[in-house]
Amino acid sequence: MKKKINLIFFVIIFFLLQNKIVLSQIENSIIISVGDYPITRLDLLKEIKLIAILSNTEINQDNKEQIQGLAVKSLIKRNIKENEIKRRNISKYNKKQLETLISSTSKKIGLDRDGLKMILENNNLSYEELIKRFETDLKWNYMIFQIYKNKISLNAAEIEDKLQLRLENLESPNDKKINLIKEQIINSEKEKKLNMFSNMHFSNLERSIQINF
């Protein structure tokens, strides 16, 4: 009788281990390759959960495919960015902007930093991975600025027109207010130009890299 119980116990343990191995193989199966870099099913599942949490969205039958599509695009985009950053040896980024990103992300879902950490941990997600994700975007921004900063040209007439439009709605304008508004307009125009260069640079990379599903 004792031998029979031991045998049954052994069989149960064996099947549990087999199921665990099969599950691990499924999670680690490659579903997309971006150049030589793989993206696994587990990567996709984590990305889906992260998108749902950061957008404060509950996944259901109506939005499941849409969120999965966003997750796939996000993984591919980040992989391409990481590869380009690594290729160009980019390590610098704006530390203050990182703090701003963490703070704004937490506030967006009604939490502080500790609350954000907790909700990620409760969903088997890594806070450190989220920080790495932010760092990737900031390193990319730094890289784009360094590459294209000498190609940013602003139209003085357009800036002046936008300034006049803003001043029409301003009560009691003075030199300080006018200079501040003008600086805001110039910074906004520079940001638009950098975004344009960023999209162009990314599109060129995307076309040059083989992506297999």
Task: Give residue spans per PLM region.
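Peptidyl-prolyl cis-trans isomerase
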Residues: 29, 38, 62-213
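Bacterial N-terminal signal peptides that target proteins for export
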Residues: 1-9
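N-terminal targeting signals for Sec/Tat export/insertion, comprising classic cleavable signal peptides
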Residues: 30-63
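Bacterial N-terminal signal peptides
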Residues: 9-16
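Boundary at the C-terminal end of the N-terminal hydrophobic targeting segment
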Residues: 23-25
